[in-house]
Amino acid sequence: MRRVSVSDPLPFSAPLAAGGEALSTSALPAGVRDVLPAEWERREHLRSHLSALLRSWGYRGVDLPALELADPAHPQGNHAFKLIDSGGQVLALRSEYTTALGRLVGTHFPSGPFPLRLQYGGRLWLRTQTSELGRLREFNQVGAELIGVTGVQADAELLALAHAALGQAGVQAQLEVGFPGFVDAALTDAGLPGPVRAALHDAIDRKSGADLDLLARQHGVSPEVTRTLHSLTELYGGPEVLTEARVLARGVRAEQAVEHLSAVHAAAQEAGVELLFDLGVSRRYGYYTGLTFRAYVDGINQPVLGGGRYALPGGLPGAGFAIGLERLAAVMPAGVPSEPETVLALDFAAATAARAAGLGAELAWTGDEAELRHYAQARGLRRWVQGAELRDVTPADLKIATEVNA
């Protein structure tokens, strides 16, 4: 066994600056923050419940490295933190999961078996403060991916799973479904050239009628086509939107998109999931190739969940969604998911009995009853346990409330 010399730093020693002085801990970079125990417990309890739900649907867990090779073609390449290792290789901190999942599938499951259902959870880092699921530069996601299959049933499964995940958190959410290819097909069917379509995509995505009119005049778009473009920006609402979209669909691609969404809607209804549709979604969704969706809840104007269908390298179909843990935990009702009560245990035997009964237990460090009572009240611990008996903390007579082994 190696002997530790007096010059070796102890594992619990304070970090030292180059001059031997303790490092300052008073400041943090913009976009990161400390997470205190109450929030941590709430977030991690939610993470555990979501992971268990995904497992119950057949989604097996994988873990992915936080460090990746920097890739200029990465969808978040311009937003990723980059660093150089000792060999001069440029690395990047993980900035999203779908690309990493694609690499994992290609490396470890090139032949399936498909469909492949995977779940993940962990931190992401973004150099900028904008992302689909958070304004922080360091944040947590839990997600699910369904790889190797496509079609109505696969899309409906993910929508139903997303709905179940939000229900696990006890929130009332609206699932908004889009299909970016519908707008692209409508613009193509209108006979507009590529550069004009590119300019119009952005205006439609922002639902800017003024910009649409300006671009239409600049590029000589006919009044009839301009009216159709305005109609695209208004395709938001319940299933009646699909009826309106059928009228605007003048080509095969647009018609196929509407029929697919109609079939997905019917399948989702069978699963008890109600959908809203936003068919004016255009280029907001990067690499997605089919159906897309987001979930919104009252009290926050950013989505707590987002996902859609995409193609992995080699054309393998995939679809999935990610949940922003910080956002969902922030709007989750108190006590949902339910958490076990934590009690103050006066000895090891009491702690063991409490934990065996499904309670959390903190072990007393002193025999001073007044000090323990003060601590329990400050921590919000309602009861303490001695032997196999749970006792109220507040009453002076410590009246027995119940028994652990009852």
UniProtKB/Swiss-Prot annotation:
Sorted UniProt keywords: Amino-acid biosynthesis, Cytoplasm, Histidine biosynthesis
Position of the signal peptide: none
Main subcellular localisation: cytoplasm
InterPro entries per UniProt: aa-tRNA-synth_II/BPL/LPL, HisRS-like_core, HisRS/HisZ, HisZ
Record's subcellular location: Cytoplasm
Amino-acid biosynthesis recorded as keyword: yes
This protein's pathway: Amino-acid biosynthesis; L-histidine biosynthesis; L-histidine from 5-phospho-alpha-D-ribose 1-diphosphate: step 1/9
GO biological process: one example: L-histidine biosynthetic process
Family statement drawn from the similarity comment of this UniProt entry: Belongs to the class-II aminoacyl-tRNA synthetase family. HisZ subfamily.
Subunit structure: Heteromultimer composed of HisG and HisZ subunits.
PANTHER family the record matches: HISTIDINE--TRNA LIGASE, MITOCHONDRIAL-RELATED, HISTIDYL-TRNA SYNTHETASE
Protein name per UniProt: ATP phosphoribosyltransferase regulatory subunit
Source organism phylogeny: Bacteria, Thermotogati, Deinococcota, Deinococci, Deinococcales
Gene: hisZ
